[in-house]
């Protein structure tokens, strides 16, 4: 008997679509009114058209981005997944008024997604990133100063 939860298959296919940079496959797994919220950057997209624009931006900034799931927790209607992303920045990145230029160096950072489902479709995706680790990986060496200047 297979004890795998049905959402485990959905989230595995979702991860494959992200790693394949297949925007249409990603969107096909979302409800029409799905919400994509990045709690680290503050960005929010509501609906597939807005989510498409977020995805285009992510894949343009990090054309080789890949997510590796570290742990996945599945309950009825909810998936929480811890992951490590690895990518090479392809465009300038600005935080706190400071801009880092692409270096060609591959970086990695950790995060967590909280994903409520409506049936087998993603109703919402809440993304939480280790922002200090992400900024350090990008080369922001004075991260504390950036955070303090934004208060």
What are the roles of these predicted feature ranges?
Residues 3-21, 29:
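Short, aromatic-enriched amphipathic alpha-helices that serve as compact interaction elements
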Residues 29, 35-46, 57-61:
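A short gly/proline-enriched turn/hairpin at secondary-structure junctions
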Residues 43-53, 74:
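Short beta-edge strand/loop motif at the mouth of beta-sheet-based domains
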Residues 11, 48-51, 65, 108:
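A structural signal for well-ordered alpha-helical scaffolds and beta->alpha junctions
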Residues 15, 40, 71-73:
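Structured beta->alpha junctions
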Residues 23-27, 32, 48, 52:
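An amphipathic alpha-helix signature
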Residues 1-6, 22-25, 56-151:
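A beta-strand edge to alpha-helix "cap/lid" segment located at domain peripheries
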